[in-house]
Each structure stands twice: as structure tokens, then as C-alpha cells.
């Protein structure tokens, strides 16, 4: 009997083991099915296949088994699955480590996770999980040491149930949408070493009870959270702390001196808050400190002398504060300092001349202070210096010779000082330099004959004393976008070679002693947006072919001796908003119609032999001109008429033939149920249905037979018969995007020549039409603010909730469309890189954005990122406030951002109220001033010159949707 019992027990154990093995295999296969969404590739987890082998699942990629073939670790990383995590995860009840990260998984977490009682590591970071985080799933996870939910879409309050995890060492809920306060109970994690709650929407005060976390080494609470109050002084008692970050968190008050007790701290990041007072000298007790960032606050006073004890410092960021006094001499003695950025303060006196002598400097920026004396000579002793920026100070003397051979340099900016002497010639041959700004100084001498640099995108030498000829070797600067040589003493002719530069967008050589004619090659530089040759001694005529400059916005050749007739082809240059031909020797009659309707008489003043059609002095000239050409016209008309008749016959034949062919060739690809056919869409491509034209193509309104209205965008230069540059795959990705503030892509119709995108129809047109047309007066401030919030939410979705993120590349008021309820929808996202016209130059097709909206760094990097979109959105906010277009209304070469900065300088007593009152849209009869000021300040944050200093779109949404209480009051009339 005893033997039978043992036998049955052994049989039962064997059955249980076999069942568990089969159960693990079955669970993995079901997990694969649920995690693979419709967008997943067929080869995702391709080795996860059914097998009769008891241990087959142990060889699956990312699977680790114990000696009993039970799954104890599952790691599915960076597999684009796009599905969800199913309840079968709970059947893998021997799991000790679960890592499912960067897989684009969506939905809520299954409660069956609570069955994983052996789990030590739970990592679900970098996915799209949503809903409240189910804290009760952790009740049975008594062994859990690491919980990482970073970068998901969780919302609601932070879960308090997890405080029962007494072995927890690592906790990250960063990068989500958690709201409410930080629970006091989080101080009960006795073994917690890392706590990351940054990048959420948390409010309230930072609990001082967090000081009870005596094992804590890293604490990150900032970015997008908006706490009330300041930094709890009690945090200074966490002696184990090595990394403390509470940036961009709405902190107020002063920096607690008690933080100086954190002797093991190596990184302190408190930037982008509202901290005031002085920098506590007690911080010098943090002898391990390597990185100190207190930038973008309201700190005052001087840099404490006691900081000389911080020998391990590698980074000092104090920029955008109100610090004063001198930059202490000991800064130059810090042996490990790599980054010194103290721009936009009130520092004065002379810089320590030993700065950089430690041989470690990489980033150096002291812009916008009151510094004097000479620039330190050894800044590039390290041979690693990347940024050398000293603009807007009172430096004198030459640029140190050590800058010339500094091959690591990427940015040289010394404008607006009193520097003089010749420029070290090596500067113009640096291989990595992207920007050289020497303007508004007293530099002299000639430019070197040989200039090179594949990375140089911005060369600005304006308002100096340079002489000699402009080197033809500038043709070697293949990345050059901006060339500013105005207000110097250059002579000779304009080198024709310059206009062979493939991405040159702006050239200003006004105010020199240049002679000769305008090079004919200028008409071949199709990327040009602004040309200024004014105030020279140029002769000859404006070259033919100007209409080739399709994106030219500014053309100024005033105050020269240019002669001949004004080219009639200018009438077709629809992008040209500023034309100045004044004070030359032009003759004949000013053309009319077309783009000439945009210009006023000042554009042509000072040309004695030039007349306007409406002037009586032109009557006889017009009569003689018409009579002398009458016979010639008769012959031409006859030839044209005969040719036209022939062309009509041929065209009608071809149209019939093509129509029969096209009816078979069009294909409709729908991203949702559409109750119309491709042929119905094509039938709407008529002149009378056009509702918009732009760089992206022509937009038609299409009314389908079932009563549906759609917007049909006919893209330029794209068809399925050509190399589609990933077009189909990308468009299908865009078609899956769903957000109430994103204009929905319904589908597309295509043949071998053309792609037609089908969008929701927006009956109220674009924001640009309402702001800059006759309708502008009907947009109240409340409506403008609402549109700003909705457009920001749409962009935020593209940047933060799409994987991979989508960069719009062409944010502007004309790409923000309004539905019947005036709700804003972001349009044309992700299309800019596909607008390739095979008939245009590559430089043309690569331009990202619209003139006036393009971020300044694009000029020298030729790259866009999400911060480029943020800059463009900031311009849109300024449009909403000011009611004016971003360019064309502020004078030659001045955009809306430059105009605001100029206006601020001209104010007698500058203040936010005075500046906003000076620039606000006069059509707004009444508005809450504090609300306008609030949005204005957000806009100015977005258009900061340096991309990293701009907020993210998440931060913009948070700021716009959480204004101070006072912004809803104070309605005034001005």
C-alpha cells in the first residue's frame, strides 16, 4: 500500500510538472498573439512557435528557464509589437524578472500580474500603457526590488498600495500623466535607493517626509510637475543622496542651505524654477559635487567664494538669473571644469585669464553680461572646446590666437562687443564649425583667400571694418545657409560662385563698396529666401530668370546704380513680400498686376526715369510703346492663335485617352470605412473646387455622392510609380493616428503619377485666414486662447504619444484648421519630408518649414527636431497675440521675434505689461491683460534662440492649461 501511495504521489508530481511546462508554452504563445497588434511585422517573435518538445519554449528569444524548464525570466525589448499585455501573463507564475520595454504596447495592465509572486524585477517602461496604475497587483510581490513604469500613459493618482513592497530599491513612475500629490506614505520604502517621479502632472507640496528614505541615492521629482512651495530643507538630511533633480517644477522660495549637508551628492539640478535669493555658500560642503545647474531662476547676489572647494565640478550652469559681481578667479583653477554657462546675468569686470588652462573646457558661454577686458587666451587648451560664445558684452582686443587652430569648435559667437584687429585665419577653415558670428565689432583686414568648412551653416560678419574682395572660395561652404557681410568695406564684384551653394537661403552684402553687376547665377540659387545687395555701387540690370526663385521673400537692391526695366516676371513671384528697387536708374513703366499689387510706391522711389501707369506722365510713353509694338503684336497673335487651336485639338484627344486610362489606374486606400469610390474623389479635382494652395500641394473640397465632404490634398512630385521614399508606409502610419486635435487622415487615392490625401473637411478654414484676413476681428481672446491650447495638445500628441515621435516640420497658422465648432486641428503633420519635386533642386526639397517659422538653429545644422516645432509653435502664439504675419510687416529681414525684441529695447520703462500693450492686436477691443501676458511669456520661452532652452510641448500644454488664477480676471479695454 505504501508503495502504491509513493507511486501515485510521483505520478501526480510528474503530471503537475508536465502540465506546468505545457502551460508555460501555451501562455507564451497566447502572449505573442495578444502583444502582436495589426501593425506588428510578421517576423516579430517569429521563433515563438508551437512544439511538442517539453523544453522548446526555453529556447524562445528573451525567455530564460530554470532547471525544471519553468520560465523564470522574460525579456521582450525593442520589438515593435503594438498590441496589449493579456491575462495569460499570470500563468507564468515562476517569473522572477519581467522586462517588456520599448514594444509600443497599449491598454491597461492585466490584474493577473498579481499572480507573479516570485517577481523581483518588473520593467514595463517605454510603452503606451494607459489608465490608472493598478497598485493592487503588487500585493503578492513581496520579493519585488525594481518597478519601472517610465514613459507610458498612466494617469490618475500615484498608487499607494505599492508601499507594502518592503524590498523595493528602484521605483520609476516618470514620464506619465500622474496627477495629484506625492503620497506621504512613499516615505515608508525603507530600502528604496532610486525614486523617479519626474515628467508627470503632480501638484501640491513636496513631502518633507521623503527625508526618511535613508537609503536613497537618486531623487528625481521635476520636469512638468508643478509643485507649490519650495524645496523642503529636510531633504538635506538624506546623507546617502548622490543625485537630486527638481527641475522645471514651479518651485519658489530660496535654496535651503541644509542641502550643503549632502556630502555624497554629485549632481544637483534645480533649473527652470522660480527660486530667488542668493546661492547658499553652504553648498560648498558638497565636496563630491560634479554637476550644478541653477539656471533659469531668479537668483541674485554673487557666486560664493567658498565654491573654490568644489574641486570635482565639471558643469556650472547659472545662466538666465540675476547674478552680479565678477566671475571669481577660482573658477579658472577648478581642475575638472568642462562646462561654464553663465549667460544672461549681470556679471561685470574682467574674466579670469586662466579660464580653460585646466585643459578640460568643452562649453563656454558668457553671453549678455557686462564683462570687459580681454578674452582668456587658453580656452581651447583642451582641444575639445565646442562652443565659444561671448556675445553682447564689452570685451576688447583680439580673438585669442588659440581659437584659430581649435578644430573641435562647433560654434563661435563673439558679436556685439568691442573686439578689434584681424581675425585668426584658421577660424575660416575649421572642419566642425557650424556657426561663426563676429558681427558688430571692429575687426579689420581681409578675409583669407581660402575658406572651407563642410559644416559651416551661418557666417555673420556684419558691421565691422573688413576690406578686400569677397573670396570666391566661399563656394566650398556647401552647408552654408546664411551669409551676412553687410556694413563693411568689401570691394570688387560679387563672386558668382557664391550662388552655387546648394542650401543658401539668406545673403546680405549691403553697405559695402561692391561694383559690377548682379551675377546671373543668383537666379539659379533656388533656395534663397532673402537677398540684400543694397547700398553698394552695383550697375547693370536685374538678371532674367528671377521667377526661378520660388521661395524668395525679400529682394533689396536699393541705393545702387542698377538700370534697365523692372523685370515683368516679378509679378509671378508669389512668395515675394518685400521688394526694394528704390534709388537706382531703372527706366520705363512699373509693371502692374500679380505680385506687384503687394508693393507700394516706396519700393520704386528715387528712380527719375521710372513712372507708374496711374501717372499722367506715363500716358505718352504708354501710347508710343503700344504703337511701336502694334505690328509686332499682330504677327505674334496670329502665330499664337494658330498654335493654340492645334494644342486644343491635341489636348482634347489626350484628355479623353488619359481619362479612360486613369479610371482604371486610381486606387483608394482607406484608414476607416469610407462610403465612396476613388473615381468620385478624382472627379472633384476641378479648378472651382480649389480651397487652398501651398508648398504641400493643392487642396480641393470634395463633395461625395453620399453627402460626405472631404478635403483632398494633391501632393506635389509624388506618385506610386516613382521611388516613394517610404511614402506609403509613412502615410499608413499617419493614417492610424487618432487625436481630437489632429486632422484625421481618412485615406488616400493614388496612381502612378499622383497621390491624393483625403482628410476631414474643416469648414472654418485655417487660423491664418482668420488672423490675417478680414475675419480676424471676430476672433475673441477667449477663442484665441482656446485654439492655442487645442493646437498645443495636438502637437504634444505627435511628440510624446506617438512611437516613434512625429516631427511636424511645418508648424504655422495656415496648418492649424478649424472645424464647425472652431475646435483646432493640426494639419499636414509629417508631410514636409515627402514634398519632393523632381524638377526642383535638392536644396529646395530639403528646406524644413515656412519662412518666419523656421527655428534659428536650422540655419547652421540643417536638422530639425521636436524643439524646432516648439519654436514654430511659439511664432503661432505670437501671431495669436499680435495679429500680424511672422514676416513682411516689420521691415527688411526682420521677423516677428526680432521685431518684439526691438520693440522691447525701445520702451522707456520695459515691463511685460508695457511690452504686451505695445504689440497686442489692436482688433482686440477687450482682453484680460494678465492672460495675454501669460501666453506671451510662454511664446517667448518657445522662441528662445537655443533649442535646449525651449520647453517641450508637454510643458507648453501644462502651462497653457494651468494658468495662474489671476489670468482669468482683469478684463480691460485699451
Curated annotation (Swiss-Prot):
Effect after changing residue 950 to K: In sunn-1; dramatic increase in root nodule number when infected by Sinorhizobium meliloti, and inhibition of root growth in both the presence and absence of rhizobia
Tissue specificity remark: Expressed in roots and shoots. Expressed in the vasculature of leaves, petioles, stems and roots.
Active site, UniProt feature: 810
Domain annotation Protein kinase: ranges: 685-972
Gene3D superfamilies, per database record: Phosphorylase Kinase, domain 1, Ribonuclease Inhibitor, Transferase(Phosphotransferase) domain 1
Entry keyword set: ATP-binding, Cell membrane, Differentiation, Glycoprotein, Growth regulation, Kinase, Leucine-rich repeat, Membrane, Nucleotide-binding, Receptor, Repeat, Serine/threonine-protein kinase, Signal, Transferase, Transmembrane, Transmembrane helix
Family matches, as SMART domains: LRR_TYP (SM00369), S_TKc (SM00220)
Cross-referenced Pfam families: LRR_1, LRR_8, LRRNT_2, Pkinase
A GO MF term: ATP binding
Membrane topology annotation: Single-pass type I membrane protein
Protein residues bound to ATP: 691-699, 713
EC number, UniProt record: 2.7.11.1
Reactions listed under catalytic activity: L-seryl-[protein] + ATP = O-phospho-L-seryl-[protein] + ADP + H(+); L-threonyl-[protein] + ATP = O-phospho-L-threonyl-[protein] + ADP + H(+)
Glycosylation sites per record: 75, 104, 123, 136, 250, 274, 312, 346, 508, 513, 556, 585
Biological function: LRR receptor kinase involved in the regulation of root growth and root nodule organogenesis. Involved in long distance nodulation signaling events. Involved in the autoregulation of nodulation (AON), a long distance systemic signaling from root to shoot and back again, which allows legumes to limit the number of root nodules formed based on available nitrogen and previous rhizobial colonization. Acts from shoot to root to control AON. Interacts with CLE12 and CLE13 signaling to control nodule numbers.
Protein name: Leucine-rich repeat receptor-like kinase protein SUNN
Species assigned in the record: Medicago truncatula (Barrel medic)
Lineage: Eukaryota, Viridiplantae, Streptophyta, Embryophyta, Tracheophyta
Amino acid at each position: 500500500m505504501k508503495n502504491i501511495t509513493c507511486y501515485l504521489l510521483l505520478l501526480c508530481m510528474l503530471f503537475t510538472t508536465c502540465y506546468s511546462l505545457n502551460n508555460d508554452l501555451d501562455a507564451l504563445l497566447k502572449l505573442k498573439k495578444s502583444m502582436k497588434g495589426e501593425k506588428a511585422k510578421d517576423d516579430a517573435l517569429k521563433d515563438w512557435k508551437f512544439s511538442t518538445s517539453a523544453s522548446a519554449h526555453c529556447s524562445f528569444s528573451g525567455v530564460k528557464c530554470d532547471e525544471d524548464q519553468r520560465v523564470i525570466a522574460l525579456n521582450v525589448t525593442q520589438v515593435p509589437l503594438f498590441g496589449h499585455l493579456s491575462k495569460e501573463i499570470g500563468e507564468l507564475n515562476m517569473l522572477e524578472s519581467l522586462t517588456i520595454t520599448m514594444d509600443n504596447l497599449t491598454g491597461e495592465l492585466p490584474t493577473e500580474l498579481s499572480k507573479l509572486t516570485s517577481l523581483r524585477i518588473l520593467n514595463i517602461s517605454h510603452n503606451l500603457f494607459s489608465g490608472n496604475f493598478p497598485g493592487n497587483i503588487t500585493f503578492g510581490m513581496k520579493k519585488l526590488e525594481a518597478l519601472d513604469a517610465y514613459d507610458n500613459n498612466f494617469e490618475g493618482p500615484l498608487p499607494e498600495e505599492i508601499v507594502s513592497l518592503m524590498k523595493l530599491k528602484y521605483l520609476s513612475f516618470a514620464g506619465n500623466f500622474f496627477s495629484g500629490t506625492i503620497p506621504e506614505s512613499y516615505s515608508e520604502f525603507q530600502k528604496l535607493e532610486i525614486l523617479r517621479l519626474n515628467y508627470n502632472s503632480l501638484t501640491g507640496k513636496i513631502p518633507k517626509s521623503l527625508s526618511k528614505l535613508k537609503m536613497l541615492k537618486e531623487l528625481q521629482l521635476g520636469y512638468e510637475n508643478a509643485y507649490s512651495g519650495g524645496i523642503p530643507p529636510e531633504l538635506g538630511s538624506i546623507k546617502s543622496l548622490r543625485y537630486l533633480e527638481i527641475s522645471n517644477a514651479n518651485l519658489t522660495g530660496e535654496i535651503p542651505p541644509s542641502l550643503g549637508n549632502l556630502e555624497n551628492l554629485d549632481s544637483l539640478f534645480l533649473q527652470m524654477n522660480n527660486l530667488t535669493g542668493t546661492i547658499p555658500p553652504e553648498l560648498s560642503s558638497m565636496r563630491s559635487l560634479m554637476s550644478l545647474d541653477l539656471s533659469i531662476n531668479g537668483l541674485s547676489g554673487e557666486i560664493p567664494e567658498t565654491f573654490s572647494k568644489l574641486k570635482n565640478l565639471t558643469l556650472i550652469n547659472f545662466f538666465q538669473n540675476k547674478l552680479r559681481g565678477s566671475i571669481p578667479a577660482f573658477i579658472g583653477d577648478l581642475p575638472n571644469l568642462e562646462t561654464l554657462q553663465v549667460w544672461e546675468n549681470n556679471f561685470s569686470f574682467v574674466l579670469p585669464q586662466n579660464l580653460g588652462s585646466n585643459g578640460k573646457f568643452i562649453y563656454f558661454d558668457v553671453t549678455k553680461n557686462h564683462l570687459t577686458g580681454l578674452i582668456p587666451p587658453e580656452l581651447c587648451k583642451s582641444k575639445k572646446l565646442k562652443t565659444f560664445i561671448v556675445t553682447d558684452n564689452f570685451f576688447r582686443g583680439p580673438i585669442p590666437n588659440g581659437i584659430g587652430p581649435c578644430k573641435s569648435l562647433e560654434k563661435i559667437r563673439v558679436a556685439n562687443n568691442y573686439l578689434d584687429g584681424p581675425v585668426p585665419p584658421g577660424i575660416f577653415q575649421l572642419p566642425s564649425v557650424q556657426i561663426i558670428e563676429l558681427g558688430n565689432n571692429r575687426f579689420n583686414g581681409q578675409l583669407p583667400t581660402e575658406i572651407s568648412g563642410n559644416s559651416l551653416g551661418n557666417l555673420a560678419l556684419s558691421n565691422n571694418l573688413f576690406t578686400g574682395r569677397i573670396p570666391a572660395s566661399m563656394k566650398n561652404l556647401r552647408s552654408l545657409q546664411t551669409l551676412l557681410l553687410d556694413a563693411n568695406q568689401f570691394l570688387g564684384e560679387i563672386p558668382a560662385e557664391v550662388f552655387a551653394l546648394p542650401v543658401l537661403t539668406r545673403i546680405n552684402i549691403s553697405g559695402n563698396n561692391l561694383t559690377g553687376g548682379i551675377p546671373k547665377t543668383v537666379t539659379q540659387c533656388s533656395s534663397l529666401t532673402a537677398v540684400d545687395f543694397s547700398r553698394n555701387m552695383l550697375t547693370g540690370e536685374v538678371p532674367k530668370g528671377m521667377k526661378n526663385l520660388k521661395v524668395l521673400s525679400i529682394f533689396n537692391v536699393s541705393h545702387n546704380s542698377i538700370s534697365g526695366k523692372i523685370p515683368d516676371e516679378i509679378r509671378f513671384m508669389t512668395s515675394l513680400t518685400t521688394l526694394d528697387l528704390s534709388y537706382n536708374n531703372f527706366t520705363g513703366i512699373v509693371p502692374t498686376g500679380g505680385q506687384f499689387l503687394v508693393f507700394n510706391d516706396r519700393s520704386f522711389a528715387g528712380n527719375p526715369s521710372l513712372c507708374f501707369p496711374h501717372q499722367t506722365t506715363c500716358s505718352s510713353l504708354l501710347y508710343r510703346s503700344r504703337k511701336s509694338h502694334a505690328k509686332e503684336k499682330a504677327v505674334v497673335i496670329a502665330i499664337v492663335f494658330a498654335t493654340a487651336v492645334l494644342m486644343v485639338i491635341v489636348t482634347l484627344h489626350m484628355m479623353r485617352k488619359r481619362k479612360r486610362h486613369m479610371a482604371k489606374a486610381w486606387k483608394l486606400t482607406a484608414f476607416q470605412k469610407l462610403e465612396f469610390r476613388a473615381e468620385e474623389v478624382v472627379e472633384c479635382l476641378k479648378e472651382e473646387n480649389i480651397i487652398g494652395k501651398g508648398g504641400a500641394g493643392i487642396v480641393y473640397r470634395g463633395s461625395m455622392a453620399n453627402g460626405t465632404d472631404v478635403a483632398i490634398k494633391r501632393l506635389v512630385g509624388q506618385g506610386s510609380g516613382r521611388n516613394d521614399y517610404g511614402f506609403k508606409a509613412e502615410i499608413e502610419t499617419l493614417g492610424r493616428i487618432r487625436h481630437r486635435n489632429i486632422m484625421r487622415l481618412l485615406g488616400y487615392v493614388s496612381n502612378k503619377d499622383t497621390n491624393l490625401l483625403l482628410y476631414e473637411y474643416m469648414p472654418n478654414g485655417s487660423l491664418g485666414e482668420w488672423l490675417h484676413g478680414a475675419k480676424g476681428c471676430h476672433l475673441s481672446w477667449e477663442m484665441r486662447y482656446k485654439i492655442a491650447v487645442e493646437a498645443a495638445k495636438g502637437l504634444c500628441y505627435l511628440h510624446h504619444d506617438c512611437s516613434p515621435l512625429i516631427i511636424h516640420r511645418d508648424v504655422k497658422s495656415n496648418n492649424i484648421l478649424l472645424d464647425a465648432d472652431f475646435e483646432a486641428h493640426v494639419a499636414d503633420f509629417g508631410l514636409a519630408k515627402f514634398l519632393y519635386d523632381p524638377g526642383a533642386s535638392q536644396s529646395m526639397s530639403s528646406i524644413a518649414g515656412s519662412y518666419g517659422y523656421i527655428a534659428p538653429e536650422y540655419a547652421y545644422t540643417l536638422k530639425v527636431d521636436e524643439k524646432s516645432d516648439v519654436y514654430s509653435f511659439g511664432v503661432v502664439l505670437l501671431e495669436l497675440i499680435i495679429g500680424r504675419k511672422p514676416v513682411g510687416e516689420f521691415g527688411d529681414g526682420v521677423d516677428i521675434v526680432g521685431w518684439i525684441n526691438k520693440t522691447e529695447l525701445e520702451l522707456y520703462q520695459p515691463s511685460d505689461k508695457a511690452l504686451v500693450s505695445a504689440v497686442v492686436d489692436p482688433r482686440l477691443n477687450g482682453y484680460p491683460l494678465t492672460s495675454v501676458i501669460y501666453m506671451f511669456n510662454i511664446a517667448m520661452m518657445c522662441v528662445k534662440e537655443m533649442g535646449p532652452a525651449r520647453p517641450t510641448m508637454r510643458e507648453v500644454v501644462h502651462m497653457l492649461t494651468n494658468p495662474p488664477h489671476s489670468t482669468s480676471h482683469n478684463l480691460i479695454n485699451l
